[in-house]
């Protein structure tokens, strides 16, 4: 469980400090949190969808998700303000590193037709977002017990000030980012 944290403290921190010329160890970018979000538009028709999605999210993250509600009514989507439309989990500290390890080593390689993650998904402040189309890429989800294939958004929030710092941090953790030359 502590493998990625030790890797960060012993090798990544000194390497990034040297690469970017940080004077203090505290200035080196680090992971702040990982947020998993599952938007469930089909929950409008069937309220059980939220419960099943929450069960999947608990298995994936090891933490109970928070239900997200519609902020305002939208006739086009047939939703009203206050209706449950998704769930999210924020992972920090040990659970965050545990999830990141499983994401990098198990889940991402199991994505169909995977050729690397887009380097363009940084937000300008060193945070990275990716979408997963199927929750079954995680080994905790048993394929034969899944009622529906659901995707999720994963946002990795770092303390990096620029995309270059965030990219270097994630590359050091072993994130499979595509080369920008392609």
Swiss-Prot record:
<protein>
    <recommendedName>
        <fullName>Large ribosomal subunit protein uL5</fullName>
    </recommendedName>
</protein>
<dbReference type="Pfam" id="PF00673">
    <property type="entry name" value="Ribosomal_L5_C"/>
</dbReference>
<comment type="function">
    <text>This is one of the proteins that bind and probably mediate the attachment of the 5S RNA into the large ribosomal subunit, where it forms part of the central protuberance. In the 70S ribosome it contacts protein S13 of the 30S subunit (bridge B1b), connecting the 2 subunits; this bridge is implicated in subunit movement. Contacts the P site tRNA; the 5S rRNA and some of its associated proteins might help stabilize positioning of ribosome-bound tRNAs.</text>
</comment>
<dbReference type="GO" id="GO:1990904">
    <property type="term" value="C:ribonucleoprotein complex"/>
</dbReference>
<dbReference type="InterPro" id="IPR022803">
    <property type="entry name" value="Ribosomal_uL5_dom_sf"/>
</dbReference>
<dbReference type="InterPro" id="IPR020930">
    <property type="entry name" value="Ribosomal_uL5_bac-type"/>
</dbReference>
<comment type="similarity">
    <text>Belongs to the universal ribosomal protein uL5 family.</text>
</comment>
<dbReference type="InterPro" id="IPR020929">
    <property type="entry name" value="Ribosomal_uL5_CS"/>
</dbReference>
<dbReference type="InterPro" id="IPR031310">
    <property type="entry name" value="Ribosomal_uL5_N"/>
</dbReference>
<dbReference type="InterPro" id="IPR031309">
    <property type="entry name" value="Ribosomal_uL5_C"/>
</dbReference>
<dbReference type="Pfam" id="PF00281">
    <property type="entry name" value="Ribosomal_L5"/>
</dbReference>
<dbReference type="GO" id="GO:0003735">
    <property type="term" value="F:structural constituent of ribosome"/>
</dbReference>
<dbReference type="InterPro" id="IPR002132">
    <property type="entry name" value="Ribosomal_uL5"/>
</dbReference>
<dbReference type="GO" id="GO:0005840">
    <property type="term" value="C:ribosome"/>
</dbReference>
<dbReference type="GO" id="GO:0000049">
    <property type="term" value="F:tRNA binding"/>
</dbReference>
<dbReference type="GO" id="GO:0019843">
    <property type="term" value="F:rRNA binding"/>
</dbReference>
<keyword id="KW-0689">Ribosomal protein</keyword>
<keyword id="KW-0694">RNA-binding</keyword>
<keyword id="KW-0699">rRNA-binding</keyword>
<comment type="subunit">
    <text>Part of the 50S ribosomal subunit; part of the 5S rRNA/L5/L18/L25 subcomplex. Contacts the 5S rRNA and the P site tRNA. Forms a bridge to the 30S subunit in the 70S ribosome.</text>
</comment>
<dbReference type="GO" id="GO:0006412">
    <property type="term" value="P:translation"/>
</dbReference>
<keyword id="KW-0687">Ribonucleoprotein</keyword>
<keyword id="KW-0820">tRNA-binding</keyword>
